[in-house]
Curated annotation (Swiss-Prot):
Pathway: Nitrogen metabolism; urea degradation; CO(2) and NH(3) from urea (urease route): step 1/1. It catalyses: urea + 2 H2O + H(+) = hydrogencarbonate + 2 NH4(+). Gene3D superfamilies: Urease, beta subunit. GO terms for biological process: urea catabolic process. This is Urease subunit beta.
Length: 101
């Protein structure tokens, strides 16, 4: 091995396989851009984002870890959400859940 060399496996990296997903349409009704990170509880996002929040409970964006989706003012965008894994316990964000889903 050469210092700094990468040894990568062949093939694609699969994430969120077997988890529940849902596609929703989101509108930014505000006057400023809103960016949502990969692991933010989508149900608790900025109220200027208009969408069916009941579908988003316990869900996050289905994008690679560390990525985000930006919603420009007035923009309508379709996004895919994926269910949180683990014990389904959510704390923080806007403190709307603070416990088990």
């Amino acid at each position: 091995m050469i210092p700094g060399e990468y040894q990568l496996a062949e093939g694609d990296i699969l994430a969120n396989v077997g988890r529940k997903t849902v596609k929703i349409e989101v509108t930014n009704s505000g006057d400023r851009p809103i960016q949502v990170g990969s692991h933010y509880h989508f149900f608790e996002t900025n109220n200027a984002l208009k969408f069916d929040r009941t579908l988003a409970r316990g869900m996050r964006l289905n994008v690679p870890s560390g990525n985000a989706v930006r919603f420009e003012p007035g923009e309508v965008k379709s996004v895919e959400l994926v269910a949180f894994g683990g014990n389904q316990i959510i704390y923080g964000f806007h403190n709307q859940i603070d416990g088990k889903l």
